[in-house]
Amino acid sequence: MTFRTNPSAPLWQTRLPATFRPSEKLAGLLQSPSLTAALRDLPCEFSVRLLYLGLADGSLLLDGGGPGKSYFCRDVELCLDGEPVVWARSQCLPSSGYWRQMLDCGNRPLGERLFAESADWQRSPLEFAALEGIPLPSVQNAQLARRSFFQRQNETLGLVECFLPALAGYL
């Protein structure tokens, strides 16, 4: 299944794009339910670098792009041995107390909090998109992204993770 709500946005699909041919190890990491856990399993030092926390325009990658729609956002880089390998954005409505509190975790991984607590949320299937030719001001050189949406008591958290070329050097 594929869909696109904005013609300049990526085409999201439930399988890895046919044009993207990752190694078996990278394919496994891309499809891991918890990217935090998958990156921590690598023989490298894993860290999170908080880039931004607060109100911002919605991400085009989460179909919240466009003027006039503000979200509470958390932008981070996931790093291996200090090198950024993933750029990620999580966003929710400013009125979402639960998800805002969840996102306020500093340099701790969001995945650590999401998967450590009792899962009283539902998660959508992972979706993938090739990013070639998509103008993304926040992300340099990302070739692929994945996203999913977490639902809890009629409140939604969107999460997009953009994979940077440096990741291949750690696999």
Name these PLM-found stretches.
Residues 1-171:
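Composition-driven recognition of glycine/serine/threonine/acidic- and proline-rich low-complexity segments
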